[in-house]
């Protein structure tokens, strides 16, 4: 008895699953088997074999009649008599008859005196052909199942009424289900599982067909290499080859199509080729490609993917509802949920649209030649064509614009034309051109580049945040991080500004016609016009109009206008022009290190009398020249004693030199300060701009000489000397004549 002792319980389980034998008294008409706890009771075993010799049928009662259980009972008696299994005392209750030599699974319901016994597998007709001489290792179960198999038919498994009834010499077939593989006779290597699967097949050779499911492949006659899984899957195929279909009614209309793959309920449900055709269609997902009739070379993966396509060719759709409205469009690629969701060409059209991402190109109707990659990329486009879009929500507002390139999150996200327009905008980078609405022919490369532009035209910007504040400016070129970053025209304006270099022209707001080339070139100018700065830090202060600075740091402190600084460091402290700040209308050539200036021809200096006024005879001549003190000397410039990093702030008046930086070459000239004394003595240089030959730089730190101005003075001196000589000659002649 089952109790608390583990070993006893395990022993009871083992005995219950064991094989028991019980002998019937010779020629007995009745027999009782009792299921009890005794270890020697065979009736407690699941498998019972009755033995003994009988001369008539014997009724066996299994007690008690209140116990519900299942037994596998074998009639192992001799004498060819039946045994009849009962449980209740009511002779009218159902019993099970087991012929001599047979085994049956019987169920006892334990209902007391009226208990019934059922044949658990009553519908099965079991025959073991291995006991006959027909074929080798065949198994058949069912009415007429495999009943035609001959000695040449081997290794067949046939289960089900009328299954494989025509098989004679076919090998290696599996037919399970009513009328499964019913017609095939002499060929093998087929698997048919399900009601009437492969029912009509009668191939001319090894078919290698696999059909699993209600009426799967039921119409196939001589089609080969098909794999069909699911109720009514491929149930119309007759001669089609190499098809794979899985799911209810998948590929259920086609008759002669080959090389199709349909996985999912109703996938490729309507495909039907009336002539032998290699469709090369692949549909995976519920209703995917369900409307395809004669379209070929389509790949449709996802629920409802391409489910409206009828005769379109060469399409690829991956994702739920991808390309789900188009009927006749061709050569489209839609990857992502709802990608190309509404595209619909009613006539055969090579769309060449590619959309990859959630709802990418979801609203395209008839636009063509679009490439859209990224979630919601180009998702409002309807008829626009030849757009290239990569990035989340890039070009996500436009519906009819064409020829746009938007690469990066939100690139050209606001562009939207009311009428068909070739925008020819290119925006590459995070938020590049994100605010452009109707601007055209802009090229914007870099994160946040031109991200405030709305209606601007013909702008080129490249580099992080270049041209990032302007809304309506036109014809600007900004190349470099932060170039023209603050330019902003609130009305349509052709700026014609060009800035190349990191933060070149960074502070320009409304200035126009400026050219800045070099990192930080012109980076503080805001409203200057016609400024040209070429070189690192050239004209890097907020300068007025018309300045030109060419060279590293050329004129970097200038705020005045119409100056020209040519050469590295020109117009800075220590250069010939000094540190130019508020200067105007000046030219500075080179820096303090220049030793020679070479030119092929003479300078031509403007001197048209029509452009002059207030003429007065020069009164400085021979006496002035005679007072000059010419010298030979070597340069020992104060700026040489200052480090590069201090030159912008040093006061040259505080510098003394000790000869350690003097040049080794000889020069000739005057001391400007001595000449200035002579000029003042002659009545000049009393007020600003009344000097003759000396000049103090704008910062007041360096004197210079304008040697070309000595020409009129020397001419005057020669004239005075000539007059004196003439007078002297006249006196000499008078004396000689006296």
Q: What does each model-found stretch correspond to?
A:
Residues 1-20, 61-63, 84-86, 92, ...:
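Fibrous stalk/shaft segments of extracellular and virion attachment machinery
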Residues 1-83:
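Exposed extracellular interaction/assembly regions and N-terminal maturation sites
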Residues 8-13, 17, 21-24, 102-117, ...:
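Extracellular receptor-binding modules and their adjoining Ser/Thr/Gly/Asp/Asn-rich linkers
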Residues 51-125:
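Acidic, glycine/polar-enriched metal-coordinating patches/loops
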Residues 124, 681, 686-738:
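C-terminal intramolecular chaperone/auto-processing assembly modules
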Residues 125-607:
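Glycine- and small/polar-enriched repetitive beta-structure motifs of secreted/surface proteins
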Residues 621-637, 642-652, 656-658:
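Acidic, glycine-rich loop-and-strand cores that form catalytic or ligand-binding grooves
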Residues 627-630, 672-687:
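Glycine-rich, acidic and aromatic/proline-enriched surface loops and short helix-turn segments
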């Amino acid at each position: 008895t089952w109790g608390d002792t583990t070993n006893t319980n395990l022993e009871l389980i083992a005995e219950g699953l064991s094989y028991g034998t019980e002998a019937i008294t010779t020629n007995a008409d009745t027999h009782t088997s009792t299921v009890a706890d005794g270890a020697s009771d065979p009736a407690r075993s699941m498998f019972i074999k009755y033995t003994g010799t009988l001369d008539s049928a014997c009724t066996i009662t299994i007690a008690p009649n209140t116990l519900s259980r299942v037994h596998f009972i074998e009639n192992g008696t001799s004498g060819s008599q039946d045994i009849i299994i009962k449980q209740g005392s009511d002779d009218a209750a159902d019993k099970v008859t087991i012929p001599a030599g047979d085994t049956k699974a019987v169920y006892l319901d334990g209902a007391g005196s009226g208990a019934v016994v059922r044949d658990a597998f009553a519908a099965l007709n079991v025959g073991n052909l291995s006991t006959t001489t027909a074929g080798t290792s065949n198994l058949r179960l069912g009415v007429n199942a495999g009943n035609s198999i001959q000695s040449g038919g081997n290794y067949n498994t046939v289960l089900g009424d009328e299954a494989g009834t025509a098989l004679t010499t076919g090998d290696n077939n599996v037919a399970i289900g009513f009328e499964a593989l019913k017609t095939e006779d002499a060929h093998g290597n087929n698997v048919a599982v399900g009601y009437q699967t492969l029912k009509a097949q009668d191939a001319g050779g090894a078919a290698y067909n696999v059909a699993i499911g209600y009426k799967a492949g039921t119409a196939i006659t001589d089609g080969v290499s098909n794999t069909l899984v699911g109720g009514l899957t491929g149930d119309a195929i007759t001669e089609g080859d190499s098809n794979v279909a899985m799911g209810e009614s998948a590929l259920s209309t086609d008759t002669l199509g080959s090389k199709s793959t349909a996985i999912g309920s109703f996938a490729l449900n309507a495909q039907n080729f009336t002539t032998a055709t290699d469709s090369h269609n692949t549909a995976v997902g519920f209703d995917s490609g369900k409307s395809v009739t004669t379209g070929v070379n389509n790949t449709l993966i996802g629920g409802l993917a391409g489910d409206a396509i009828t005769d379109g060719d060469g399409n690829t759709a991956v994702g739920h509802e991808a390309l789900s409205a188009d009927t006749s469009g061709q050569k489209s690629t839609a990857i992502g949920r709802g990608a190309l969701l509404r595209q619909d060409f009613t006539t055969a059209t090579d769309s060449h649209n590619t959309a990859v991402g959630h709802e990418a190109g979801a609203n395209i109707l008839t636009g063509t030649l679009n490439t859209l990659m990224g979630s919601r990329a180009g998702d409002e486009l309807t008829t626009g064509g030849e757009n290239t879009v990569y990035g989340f929500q890039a070009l996500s507002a436009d519906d009819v614009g064409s020829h746009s390139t938007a690469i990066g999150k939100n690139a050209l996200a606001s562009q939207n034309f009311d009428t068909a327009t070739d925008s020819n905008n290119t925006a590459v980078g995070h938020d590049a051109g994100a605010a452009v609405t109707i601007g055209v022919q802009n090229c914007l490369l870099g994160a946040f580049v031109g991200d405030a532009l709305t209606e601007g035209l013909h702008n080129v910007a490249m580099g992080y945040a270049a041209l990032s504040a302007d809304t309506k400016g036109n014809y600007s070129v900004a190349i470099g991080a932060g170039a023209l970053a603050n330019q902003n025209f609130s009305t349509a304006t052709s700026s014609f500004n060009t800035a190349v270099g990191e933060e070149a022209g960074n502070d320009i707001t409304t200035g126009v016609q400026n050219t800045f080339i070099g990192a930080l070139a012109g980076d503080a100018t805001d409203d200057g016009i016609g400024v040209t700065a070429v070189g690192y830090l050239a004209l890097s202060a907020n300068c007025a109009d018309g300045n030109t600075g060419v060279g590293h740091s050329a004129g970097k402190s200038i705020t005045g206008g119409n100056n020209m600084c040519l050469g590295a460091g020109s117009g800075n402290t220590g250069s010939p022009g000094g540190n130019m700040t508020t200067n105007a209308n000046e030219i500075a050539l080179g820096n303090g290190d220049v030793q020679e200036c070479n030119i092929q021809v003479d300078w031509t200096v403007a001197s048209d009398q029509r452009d002059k006024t207030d003429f007065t005879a020069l009164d400085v001549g021979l006496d002035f020249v005679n007072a000059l003190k010419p010298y030979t000397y070597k340069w020992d410039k104060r700026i040489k004693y200052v480090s590069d990093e201090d030159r912008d702030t040093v006061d040259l008046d505080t510098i003394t030199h000790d000869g350690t930086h003097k040049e080794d070459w000889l020069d000739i000239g005057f001391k400007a300060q001595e000449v200035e004394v002579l000029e003042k003595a002659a009545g000049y240089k009393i007020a600003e701009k009344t000097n003759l030959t000396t000049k103090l730089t704008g910062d007041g730190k360096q004197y210079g000489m304008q040697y070309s101005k000595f020409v009129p003075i020397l001419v005057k001196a020669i004239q005075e000397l000539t007059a004196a000589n003439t007078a002297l000659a006249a006196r000499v002649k008078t004396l000689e004549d006296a």
